[in-house]
A protein has these predicted regions:
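Phosphate-coordination/substrate-recognition cap region in phosphate-metabolizing enzymes
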Residues: 3-12, 51-120, 124-131
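Acidic, low-complexity terminal tails and accessory targeting/binding regions
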Residues: 1-16, 52, 98-110, 173, ...
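Short hydrophobic/aromatic-enriched beta-strand-loop microsegments
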Residues: 40, 87-94, 201-210
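Active-site signature of alpha/beta-hydrolase-fold catalytic machinery across serine-
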Residues: 83, 192, 196
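Short glycine/proline- and acidic residue-enriched helix-loop micro-motifs
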Residues: 116-159
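Loop-to-helix element that buttresses phosphate recognition and phosphoryl-transfer chemistry
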Residues: 18-83, 150-165
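Glycine-rich phosphate-binding loop signature in dinucleotide/nucleotide-binding domains
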Residues: 59-65, 171-180
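Beta-strand elements within well-structured catalytic alpha/beta cores of enzymes
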Residues: 15-21, 70, 179-189
Length: 232
């Protein structure tokens, strides 16, 4: 852990909050919004999860204690945790990806075509999308696997941020007790978790890039919540 210790006067003693994004899926390749649909990792995603686990073990050779690893219940996150070598996890519904509502399973261009203008989830959220876009269907993946897609009303960025704050509220006592905590989840919700850790506007998560199967580290410096490392 010495690589991650802050140094100098005011260096903090609490543990670190480590964020690990899941590996690649067919929909992360195609650009389809993947919120609550239970898309599995593809072959490349499984390879990425193995490699991501190696990097994470190199950074945290002592690992994470029992009760200090949390995963989204969605398959792509659970598979990543297991392949990365962190199978002793607790699932948290609050770590599920942002619910994109009517945009679920669609590409950004498709959503824009319905609205008649470019759409950005950070700017407008799912709440501006028409109810006629909602529905249920079955999507066939490139490997011929099938996933059930549910496209409901979705959630606002503020609702996603409220979930993120609940996660932070759960892990903060563990960190203050000196434990390192690992969260395995999804790009948007982990970026929103980061904004709430920094006490920032959740919309500012758009300025953080977190690649598949990469990790980031949050912590304290002089009692302030900070980003220690990003997108490793």
């Amino acid at each position: 852990m010495t690589d991650y210790l802050t140094s100098g006067e005011g260096a903090s003693k609490p543990g670190y909050l480590v964020l690990l994004r899941h590996g690649q899926t067919a929909w992360s390749v195609s650009g389809q919004y993947t919120g609550r649909t239970d898309v599995p990792l593809n072959e490349e995603g499984r390879r990425q999860a193995l490699e991501g686990g190696k990097r994470l073990r190199g950074a945290f050779p002592d690992g994470f204690g029992r009760g200090h690893i949390f995963s989204s219940p969605l398959r792509r996150a659970r598979e990543t945790a297991q392949l990365a070598g962190y199978s002793d996890f607790e699932t948290l519904d609050d770590l599920m990806e942002w619910d994109y509502g009517p945009a679920e399973g669609r590409r950004r261009e498709e959503v824009g075509a319905v609205l008649g203008h470019d759409w950005c989830v950070w700017d407008e959220g799912p709440e501006v999308l028409p109810a006629r876009m909602q529905g249920d269907w079955v999507c066939t993946l490139p490997d011929s696997g099938k996933v059930d897609v549910h496209s409901g009303a979705g959630e606002t960025v503020d609702e996603a941020a409220a979930r993120a704050r609940r996660v932070i509220g759960k892990v903060t006592p563990l960190m203050l007790a000196g434990h390192n905590v690992l969260l395995v989840a999804h790009a948007h919700i982990l970026r929103i978790v980061t904004t709430q850790w920094l006490r920032a506007d959740p919309h500012s998560g758009r300025f953080l890039r977190l690649d598949t199967a990469h990790h980031s580290v949050l912590g304290y410096y002089k009692d302030d919540p900070v980003i220690i490392h990003w997108n490793i």
